[in-house]
Amino acid sequence: MDRKREPVRALELFCGIGGFAEAACEKADVVAAVDQSEIALSVYRLNRPSTPVKGFNLETVSPAVLADFNADMWWLSPPCQPYTVRGKCRDLEDSRASSLRRILSILPQVRPFSLGLENVEGFAASEARNLLVSVLKSCGYRIREISLCPTRFGVPNRRPRYYLFASLGELGEMDEAKISEYSMRDFLDGRPSPELALPPGIVERFGRGLPTLDPDDRNAYAACFASSYGKALMHSGSYLVHNGGLRRFSPDEILRFHGFPAAFKWPPKLGLRKRWHLAGNSLSVFVLRRALSILPHFK
């Protein structure tokens, strides 16, 4: 009889609302989830009350603190702004990259068995990526880098991302199976809130320049939803044709595109704009669940 493999002890750094934990499911025991955002941690606590959450600054974390978690795997979703055009592509000179630099300075002293990282595609050509790969190679890790988008797995949402997986053991092949052939309507709320509607004046003035979708178009793909969705009108995500006008996607709809479960909850007092920000800042559970199969623990 085959013995069931024990879940890997995972440390979720830059955890946000818990995308990694959702993707890893029963294959990982998240020993701690770390983030600076108390708002993100409040969402994490609500949905995973048994997971210890830690709100501290990774820029100044000590090797002993990370070592004490005794994690077999580290997962990282560090800030993406240093590697985006809107963030001025300042790379390692950006103060928001300091936390990643600190973790990489500690890595040779702690050496978890495996590590994974997700970021925007611009990270692939960054000095931060070069530093990451250099540190990993010097520590003896095997490395796999890949660019993935939800559309590759049948999800109608463009969100291309860079992924890196590293292990002191062997790396495997990714599960390439499509999730399903979804239509846009599969992700939409049954009764969307009226507050999602764009004012007629905004539609009249800017409507032609906005990425709009017909929910009945089976070939439609939603643009990447950014953390600024709901705040910035342009370059932050798509809009739906609705009742003769346009409306925004709801935070719950964005989470469905990501692959979060229907049971996922928001704190009741958390406003719409904060929900948009956190949903846009999260990752594709659909994609990560398949990408994690590269690591030996997740086969």
Task: For each feature predicted by the language model, list its residue ranges.
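Short beta-strand element of Class I
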Residues: 30-34
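Class I SAM-dependent methyltransferase "Motif I" SAM/SAH-binding loop
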Residues: 13-15
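Conserved beta-strand elements of the Class I
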Residues: 9-11
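Conserved SAM/SAH-binding beta-strand->alpha-helix loop
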Residues: 37-38
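S-adenosyl-L-methionine
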Residues: 42-68
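Conserved SAM-binding loop of SAM-dependent methyltransferases across substrates and taxa
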Residues: 17-28
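C-terminal target-recognition/interaction regions appended to catalytic cores
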Residues: 199-299
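Class I S-adenosyl-L-methionine
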Residues: 61-73, 80-231, 246-247
